[in-house]
Amino acid sequence: MLFTGTLLFLSCQYSGPVEEALRQSGRNRSELERVLDFYREKGDDLSLQAAKFLISEMPGHHSLENSSLSEFRQALDTMYPQMSNVIKRVVYQVPYRKDEFVANAEKRYDLETLSADYLIAHIDNIVEMWRKCSWLKDYSFEEFCEYLLPYRFAREPLLTRFDSTTYWWQEIKARTEYYKHLPPSPMELRHFLHGIIDRQDDPYMQDFELPMSKGKHTFDCLDKCYYNLSTLRSAGIPCAIDYVPAWPTRNGTHYWWVLIDPLCMHNTYSDTQNPRAAKVLRQTYSHHPVPRPGKNEYIPEQFLNPFNKDVTAEYVKVSDVKLSFPLFRQRHAYLAVFNEMSWKPVAWAKIRGGRALFKEMGRSVVYLPVCYKKEQLCSAGNPILLKSDGSTVELNPKSERFSLTLTRKYPLTYSKTQWSRNMLDCRFEAGDDSTFRDSTVVFHISRPDPNLNYVEVFVPDSIGAFRCWRIIGPKRIWLGELAFYSKEGEKLSGRTIYHPEDKGETPENAFDNDELTYTNVYAWLGKDFERPEKVSKIRYISRTDANGIIRGMEYGLMYFDRQWFSAGRQTAVADSLVFDSLPAGALFWLRNLTEGREERIFTYDSEFDRIVYW
């Protein structure tokens, strides 16, 4: 009898990850075991393997709960009773970004709360999809588990009541069977899905009212990713969310959704691509390695999230980077990129024998090796440049000195150069009245300003006094500021005038002393001074990002030598700054100490006499 009981006990044991998950589930273990027993007794091995995958990877997955979040969801359901589940999964998470909602929120772990009935209903639906949808036959079981099977994609509250969106895959299947000669690629299937959804969810994506007087909300890139993931997987289209935790060449982060196609590496919108990324991560249901802290070692929270897969190599050329960390006793080191005017770690590695190997780092990026002392980020040397060919160069300041003229603190993009190019062929005219019937041409703009900065036009003495002055062009004029000055240097004031057919383009923005506000006026814009005025100077700026050198503002140039050092401070008296005695080979950072938040690190290329932003 004892022998028989031992056999029964052993038959209930599972492989390591499944058993560990069951152990962590506490009182909910019986619910999860009921799922496994259901498929074992049914003899459905595919569904059993799917259940084992979901349970083994379930540790750590959770939603957030407190009275405020519950009240928000109830109010949302009352306000929008027709809202589909795919939208609810997204909007239910909007309060997660507000401190007043999540300050005392409790993590509700799936292992401890999911019912057997919910999991069985979910697995039955997705496995039926897998078996019946012809377009899924080329996907591996591993891809099916990762990109279709999961019941959640983030920390959203789980919806136990299924709606019609749960079975969209059946409608997609019917359409592919009707159009038998259409190869069902993921992108083609997505077009079918658009036909099913139509525009029914559009009202919830832009400027829609939230309950509990929380204002209006417009979907950002992460919301749109969640929505697309929710809709695509409901339609039987494997997909995932990829993201850049911190851009290495500009501020911010970015999320986008990606179709998983077994016949090509990835299939995304072109505007989500960037030629330089340090790390690209994919949000997953399954676990991936995370650093294990040593005694009293601080690990940033972002690296403790096990649901991230490194997919950098699917987007950019990568190289491994091996660096020395001889002075640090921590277990882990990091590589950081410059983002939002600070160094932000994007990769980690274990220190072994005083060295750390960082795998698959994006090329053409400047990295700073760093470690943490308690929670303080500390540089572990000077920045390195991982070049496009995979080699590395340490950016060490040298004893050799040079001078540098600076006209901007942030790189241009092609689209921004169009702002100043739009000013080409515009001209300034003066006339006796606002009809400009017998106008006098004062100046013709023949070249764009390369720095998107102010341009001064000195009016010849031969030009007399006129009541009305304007800028006129062959098309719309993108203008940030426009001012007319007297011989004494005083700014002249008058009534704003513009083309009579121009409406709603806020022409006043060109005269509000703020170059970041702009107007896109039709044909022409100017001033009526009510009496003839002798103008000696015209000062204008196209639409701009205000990252040029602006007179009157204070700037500081920094260089890095294991930390930031000042190379000098100046108040701008012209549209450029000159700094002398700068160390060659260093990494620099020009700061606007008066205002602004867009600033980039750079090096100086003496061979081509140019600044290279990173």
PLM features: what roles do these ranges have?
Residues 304-312, 382-408, 608-614:
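Extracellular beta-sheet/turn segments enriched in Thr/Pro/Gly and aliphatic residues
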Residues 317-327, 406-410, 414:
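A short, amphipathic beta-strand motif
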Residues 375-396, 480-481, 597-607:
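Edge beta-strands of extracellular beta-sandwich domains
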Residues 342-354, 568-572:
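Short, acidic Ser/Thr/Gly-rich low-complexity loop/linker segments typical of extracellular
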Residues 17-26, 40-42, 175-192, 201-211, ...:
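Hydrophobic/aromatic-rich core segments of domains that either
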